[in-house]
Amino acid sequence: MNGVRCGRIWLSTALAGLFSYFFVVCPRMGNAENKAEAQIDWAMAREWWAFQSPTKAELPQINQAAWPSRRIDHFVLAKLEAKKLSPSPAATKHTLARRLYLDLTGLPPTPEKMRAFLGDETDGAYEMLVEKLMQRTAYGERLASMWLNKARYAEDQAHQVGDNTAFFYPNAFKYRKWVIDAFNNDLPYDDFIRKQLAADLEKDKSVTDLPALGFIGLGHKFYNRNRLTVKAEEWSEQVDTLTRAFLGLTVACAQCHDHKYDPVTQKDYYALAGVFASTDLVDRMEDGSEIKKDSEAHKKRIGIIHIVRDTKPKDLHVFLRGNTETKGDLVKRRFLKVLAQNEPKSFTQGSGRLELAEAIADPNNPLTARVIVNRVWLIFFGRGLVATPSNFGQLGSLPSHSELLDDLAVRFMENNWSIKWLVRELVLSSTYQQNSQIISRNELIDPANIYLWRMNRRRLSVEQWRDSILAASNNLDRRGGESLELTDAKNVRRTIYGRVSRKKLSDILIQFDYPDANVHSAKRSDTTTAIQKLFIINSSFMVEQAKGLAKRITGDSSATDLTHIQSTYALLYNRQPTREETDLGLAFLRLPAEGKLTRWEQYSHALLAANEMMFVD
């Protein structure tokens, strides 16, 4: 019978989908009976595309043989031709430079850098720019902005009793720094996984990698943590973050019952939860040693890192229907059955964290490389090849270019799991270098641009947008280190170094679509609200940056207003103003000043508030 089992009855697939819509995909408490694990045909379950090992495909036949510049382009063009679509012309050098700077560093090029690139007529100038930008510290900061949301990075908890901050993370920034350095040093992604789960257990462990354990160590700590029900909530959050981030699976949906749609059983869930039940979240000195009682580090939590340690290994019983008082079978710690060729082996080394990391980073794991390749693709194209980047299961989207995704995943692993290799493949492709202009005939066939007949015009993240404004006003401070409040008027550092709170996220982050730091975020949302425009028009932050921009532009008193207007456009938008824009600016500047701001400050504010500051073509 086709459908989904719900308790003692079968629902049609359509009705099951309706059920999931109203009751959410993974309810906390199911109404199912206390029943034996549902019988799953594992061979059939492994036929799902995401559970099949990716393979390197033969290049498809294409008609426009001159268009591709990388392997990626062959797959994209073949799909376009099959859909009767044509690729767009290449973007201008100016557009490509701005796109590349913002995508790789999160900052636009300065007018001087733009002029240098536009004036460089040598072969390989674009390729050289890619390499230069990937060597900047800003590259790691840009990529880390993506990853920290996957790890639900934050520096406190969503709850606080009185003035008690014992469960807060004042040194969470050390995990952030480790992530930034990992991307800048091109740490192989399989090692990136191992170190975040088990840096303390590796054979060749280094104390410099211990902050990586913040992936687990910065998780939720609830009050009354000694109670089993509270511990179970913490384990659930850890399993959810781990499996969605690295595997693109919603395994925590199997906490109370077998997963309703994917071949993940309750036993699978408790097998993973047992790893976290055997792991403690702890504070340690930077070398991993215990903090001495009554020391400065103990009293003020200075010079410490928030990591984990193994406790006595503990296998868990299944909690029937999620009820910790109703125990079912004891489950050995192990990996997911659907991702094992036969029966998964039990974890026997301590908590099992290292074995879990190895299972995730195993090249034979069909999900890991696909998931990260798709996440990186999403960063540079605005939409993943799989539109649901943290759900590769039955309720997720099918890949738009399955052969391309698999080919990239295999080659990514063959190239030492190098993120820089992957980024290079993407940005050097003809697909990435297309312009973003609408072609009416193509739009009629593919209005959502699923098949990549043009580049997507994308809205900047809050980090890119705020940092670009600070750079334009000449106020940007490039230093890293400890976090500062984004509400602090003196904080002009890059946005990634702002404090992230689970309890009260900064207003600017909330208003401009920064994700909830309490949970793993699959991808950013793009919203347009009146509150955003009110912030842009009225906030003291924007006013101060407008003053800084006006001062920077008009510093040369010998230049004319026309020259100043041209300089402003070059600085903000990396282009020259049109005749209409020039005339409008000159007319505005001739008017008498109103209010507390000078005419140039008002003009600067208006240009900073423009939509063009928030988008990249």
Task: List each model region and its residues.
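Globin-like tetrapyrrole-binding proteins
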Residues: 603
